[in-house]
Amino acid sequence: MGGRRGPNRTSYCRNPLCEPGSSGGSSGSHTSSASVTSVRSRTRSSSGTGLSSPPLATQTVVPLQHCKIPELPVQASILFELQLFFCQLIALFVHYINIYKTVWWYPPSHPPSHTSLNFHLIDFNLLMVTTIVLGRRFIGSIVKEASQRGKVSLFRSILLFLTRFTVLTATGWSLCRSLIHLFRTYSFLNLLFLCYPFGMYIPFLQLNCDLRKTSLFNHMASMGPREAVSGLAKSRDYLLTLRETWKQHTRQLYGPDAMPTHACCLSPSLIRSEVEFLKMDFNWRMKEVLVSSMLSAYYVAFVPVWFVKNTHYYDKRWSCELFLLVSISTSVILMQHLLPASYCDLLHKAAAHLGCWQKVDPALCSNVLQHPWTEECMWPQGVLVKHSKNVYKAVGHYNVAIPSDVSHFRFHFFFSKPLRILNILLLLEGAVIVYQLYSLMSSEKWHQTISLALILFSNYYAFFKLLRDRLVLGKAYSYSASPQRDLDHRFS
């Protein structure tokens, strides 16, 4: 009830949980510890609101014990790219069956055909360009493996040089020869449809490039009228941006080769900096997955259809269905490679250190002690803080996140449970397999039966690896959950 503060009304202090700079340092072990918060404060009496802020003098930031997961086998980059290229070739092959199938089983009274495909209608130059585009990652992995630097024998260095020279020469010659033929045969609109995804490839990936290092946007924003006219400066800035984008793209192209590490520290500012870096790295990997999967599905499902003659009949519904199947399957395979178990565990550790805040209605906690949030404090679980005229409740064991930062909340939501990404991939791949099995049983056309049967094999292999990782990691995290509960009860 409202009223004037009388002489017998108790006044409570609103000191912060810890002084700025009191929580710092780092530890390289798997167990993190934090000092006991010893600020004296008492909670106000709660008038039936159901919310309470625990006495901070008895609160302890519970130490985290990170789970040691087993090292699961990671597929080599060149083998993974070969597997992905083989799956895309299968999808391209079954689409060509859908487009150029024949009626070879008809009697001679009908238009006969001695082959199952109309090979005379297939443009092999277009097929060559499509194959090179689909195999760009595999070609890049071969060149990278053949460009290894170090102490190698003379025979091995000559062999690597010949391999790199042969692959690049054969790819460049085949691509140039096929493109010249296509430029002479088709219209400008067809060629634009063929090549325009590459015009969006670098700019799309460039959006996530760390341009703060190059200060490109700051430089462009501060340019005067005379500098803006200078074409040389623009070209240099654009080339610099392309170089940084391509460097980051090639670093992430082969997944586990460049895996970030986790610094198990107690400094709130360092924890937030680590989370920002991991967010950038994760967004880049997801962008690589999105671009690669859409590009593969585009060249498998849409490009062959666009260059078909108007008088030629094909199943348009099956082409659209194949586009969805290829894009989803490629996305799952790439995410499984770019987001391995060790990387998901790293994100989980960072989310556990970051913590999370839950927004609370101020009317429900008007009689509960609310501490002003400070960025250098490590807040224990259950504490109420006031930030930006709102009230938040600490949810995690460690809580160093900014309460009003939505990106911190999303990061903790996705990665607080280490198996969440793996479960999503497993459910998605399982749904695709169930749909393909249903389509296979209900299919009445021979080319669709062959297509679904071939595509299913690649999805079976991806599903097997996901299920294996899920079972192994599920056991590992369940074993580590019981000691953590005992530790929580000991400090509570």
Swiss-Prot record:
Region annotation Disordered: where it falls in the sequence: 1-54
GO cellular component: a single term: membrane
Residues that carry a glycan: 8
Signal sequence, start to end: none
Pfam families: Tmp39
Transmembrane segments: 77-97, 115-135, 153-175, 185-205, 288-308, 322-342, 421-441, 447-467
Biased composition (Low complexity): 28-53
Keywords: Endoplasmic reticulum, Glycoprotein, Membrane, Transmembrane, Transmembrane helix
Record's keyword annotation contains Endoplasmic reticulum: yes
Keyword Glycoprotein part of the UniProt annotation: yes
Location(s), subcellular: Endoplasmic reticulum membrane
Cystine bridges: none
Membrane topology term: Multi-pass membrane protein
PANTHER family in UniProt: FI21814P1, TRANSMEMBRANE PROTEIN 39B
Membership in a protein family: Belongs to the TMEM39 family.
Stated role: May protect the cells against DNA damage caused by exposure to the cold-warming stress and facilitates tissue damage repair during the recovery phase.
Protein known as: Transmembrane protein 39B
Organism annotation: Homo sapiens
